[in-house]
């Protein structure tokens, strides 16, 4: 009995109604997992040395290493090379049949030194951390399509571990704490905390076109940018002399200059350094049956003193600074068609929770 007329299979569509997608159908995709796939894991090593000197200094040295054993890697089973551009970069296509597999690349290494000392009623602390972290995929999405497609790369699936999006290479923190009695025998405490750290890494990429060079199934804007060597770069066609002048002025005045004539690596650049200074003042008041604690928090004192300070300026994980022609990103000779430059693409002030503005908070609590 045909499926369409079988009353026990009423939910099935007759085979004659099925439609087999064509090879280029954007929805005819499949996803799979490598049968040998292993859950992400890493080898971790840590060593620390604590010292207390005769002068009362408490010093700590610490080293941490997190070496990838197995990490996540995505590939398109239909990935293929369509052509090669003048600079040697490949242009690729794909089917969107994403396969989840493993890579052994990636690591995180961190050094930390800290010191603590009491000077009577004053307590002082300072610590510095230097970190280097590398990975392949940012994994900022729960879907394979976006995890695969929203990863900055230079040549298709030929990817090596580069600096992580979320790495803070340098971080310095220092605190000062002073306790005295200004009202009878009740403690009055002043606490200052200062933090200074380097900005997170970001990539300079191309902009202005829809399909990525790395895979036509992916969105544009994630291809690491080729940096022209000059107005007469043989791998580039500028839309005009004015465009060439603007692009090269930007290149020569920034860190892009060290990559002239080549492709800027993923996360080769850092957002600006940022600093913060916070103050807390607490006053204890003894009630005989308990204690009232009044507190005043002043966060981002730097911004309070100067409106141009204490502001966190960051680039998103990619800055699409080199703009290609929307319809023809490269010509018949494989040369990039550059039509403009956007030096500040992706640069924004991070103030989601008030980090870039000062705040006052006054409150109290009662302890029985």
Region annotations inferred by a language model:
Residues 189-288, 319-348:
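Extracytoplasmic gating/loop element in the C-terminal half of outer-membrane beta-barrel translocons
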Residues 1-99, 235, 256, 261, ...:
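Solvent-exposed loop/turn elements at secondary-structure boundaries
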Residues 27-29, 35-41, 102-107, 116, ...:
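Short sequence motifs at beta-strands and strand-loop junctions characteristic
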Residues 352-368:
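Outer-membrane beta-barrel "beta-signal"
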Residues 1, 27-28, 60, 69-80, ...:
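Outer-membrane beta-barrel and related beta-rich outer-membrane complex signature
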Residues 50, 114-118, 177-179, 282-284, ...:
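Transmembrane beta-barrel domains of outer membrane proteins
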Residues 33, 43-47, 107-113, 170-176, ...:
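Hydrophobic, lipid-facing positions within transmembrane beta-strands of outer-membrane proteins
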Residues 60-203:
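Gram-negative outer-membrane beta-barrel transporters
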């Amino acid at each position: 009995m045909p499926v369409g007329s079988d009353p026990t299979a009423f939910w099935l569509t007759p085979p004659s109604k099925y439609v087999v997608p064509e090879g280029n159908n954007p929805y005819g995709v499949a996803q799979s997992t490598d049968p040998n796939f292993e859950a992400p894991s890493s080898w971790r090593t840590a060593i620390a040395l604590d010292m207390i000197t005769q002068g009362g200094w408490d010093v700590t040295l610490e080293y941490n290493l997190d070496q990838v054993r197995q990490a996540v890697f995505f590939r398109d089973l239909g990935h293929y090379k369509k052509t090669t551009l003048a600079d040697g970069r490949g242009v690729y296509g794909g089917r969107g049949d994403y396969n989840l597999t493993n890579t052994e690349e990636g690591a995180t290494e961190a050094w930390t030194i800290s010191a603590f000392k009491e000077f009577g009623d004053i307590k002082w602390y300072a610590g510095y951390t230097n970190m280097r972290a590398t990975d392949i995929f940012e994994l900022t999405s729960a879907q394979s399509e976006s995890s695969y497609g929203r990863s900055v790369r230079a040549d298709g699936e030929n990817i090596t571990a580069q600096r992580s999006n979320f790495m803070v290479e340098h971080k310095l923190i220092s605190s000062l704490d002073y306790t005295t009695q200004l009202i009878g025998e009740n403690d009055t405490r002043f606490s200052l905390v200062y933090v200074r750290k380097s900005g997170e890494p970001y990539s300079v990429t191309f902009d202005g076109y829809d399909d990525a060079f790395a895979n036509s199934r992916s969105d544009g804007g994630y291809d690491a940018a080729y940096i022209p060597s000059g107005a007469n770069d043989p791998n580039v066609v500028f839309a005009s002399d004015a465009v060439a002048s603007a692009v090269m002025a930007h290149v020569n005045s920034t860190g892009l200059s060290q990559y002239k004539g080549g492709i800027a690596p993923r996360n080769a650049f850092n957002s600006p350094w940022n600093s913060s200074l916070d103050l807390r003042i607490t006053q204890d008041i003894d009630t005989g049956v308990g204690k009232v604690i009044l507190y005043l928090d002043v966060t981002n004192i730097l911004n309070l003193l100067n409106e141009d300070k204490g502001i966190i300026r960051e680039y998103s994980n990619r800055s699409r600074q080199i703009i290609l022609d929307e319809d023809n990103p490269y010509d018949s000779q494989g040369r990039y068609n550059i039509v403009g430059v956007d030096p500040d693409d992706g640069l924004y002030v991070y103030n989601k929770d008030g980090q870039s503005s000062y705040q006052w908070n006054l409150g109290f609590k009662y302890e029985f």
